[in-house]
């Protein structure tokens, strides 16, 4: 009992710097060794920064590309509906571990005020508060959270997934911030091929830490779809700020940024692209991605 208490205190009190999405269908669930179920794993959580393409793509730097979910397990995407995942700093603080006994409304398993925010001085990050909690969220408050996204590729074999066939299909503003996050699915998203699709959870924080990015692997399946539409070939995104006329219209690739190679977007110093209108991504389901 004492050992369990010490472990939980250690996990909850650590100064985490990162967040990932936890749900069925994820790669590296329980760690990067499919033979071992580590319920306290955070290996999928670490960000991607200044890495060669061969390492950042699909989290190959930690072997997550080689740790798929069990056969037949998918993240279900209901066409025209919504799906919910858990954003957390460690699998321990989700319902995928310990029967959900360590979950709260927050990604770190802690308890925070509903209007949790950083101080109104300097950059004002959550981690600038006494105690330094909240650094994982890279934000001042919920409103300033940069937004997260999901992309889909209609390639059942992940070896065939590329930037030019991986299309962002939904975004969620003001995330990551709370544990539960619900994303909208375009109604015209077509069914996946036999063996399912590849999906990626995506995030580029806006300040409050290292200028990194996130790409997390999933096997996914579009459910309830009778659509015969096809997804367009995505274009690289462009940072457009407040001038929407400069934004890329239609299907867009994920943001590949601040890596040694493989980047598809460049910004001025201090400018952060994100899965939001400043980089051409509308809020919610991306209904303009079809041919």
Curated annotation (Swiss-Prot):
**Which keywords describe this protein according to UniProt?**
Copper, Disulfide bond, Glycoprotein, Metal-binding, Monooxygenase, Oxidoreductase, Secreted, Signal
Q: What class of enzyme is it?
A: oxidoreductase
What are its E.C. numbers?
Answer: 1.14.99.-
List, alphabetically, the Pfam families matched. Answer: LPMO_AA14
Look up the domain of life of the source: Eukaryota
Q: Sites of glycosylation?
A: 141
| Location (main, coarse) | secreted
Q: Its Gene Ontology molecular function terms?
A: metal ion binding; monooxygenase activity
Q: List the disulfide bonds.
A: 192-197, 199-220, 240-247
Characterize the pH dependence: Optimum pH is 6.0.
Keyword Transcription regulation in the entry? The reply is no
Cofactor note from UniProt?
Binds 1 copper ion per subunit.
Question: How would you summarize this protein's biotechnological applications?
Answer: AA14 provides a potential way for industrial preparations of feruloylated oligosaccharides (FOs) or xylo-oligosaccharides (XOS) from biomass. Synergistic reactions with other polysaccharadide degrading enzymes such as the GH10 endoxylanase XYN1 or the debranching enzyme ABF62C from Penicillium parvum are important for industrial applications.
Q: Where in the cell is it found?
A: Secreted
* Cofactor(s) this protein cannot do without: Cu(2+)
Q: Name one GO cellular component term.
A: extracellular region
Residues of the signal peptide: 1-17
Temperature characteristics of this protein = Optimum temperature is 40.0 degrees Celsius.
Q: What does this protein do?
A: Lytic polysaccharide monooxygenase (LPMO) that is active against heteroxylan, xyloglucan and cellulose in beta-cellulose and released native oligosaccharides and corresponding C1- and/or C4-oxidized products. May act mainly on heteroxylan with numerous arabinosyl substituents between cellulose fibers rather than on recalcitrant xylan tightly associated with cellulose. Catalysis by LPMOs requires the reduction of the active-site copper from Cu(II) to Cu(I) by a reducing agent and H(2)O(2) or O(2) as a cosubstrate.
Indicate the family of this protein.
Belongs to the polysaccharide monooxygenase AA14 family.
List the protein's name.
Answer: AA14 family lytic polysaccharide monooxygenase
Source organism of this protein record? Sordaria brevicollis
Lineage of the species this protein comes from: Eukaryota, Fungi, Dikarya, Ascomycota, Pezizomycotina
- The record's gene field reads AA14
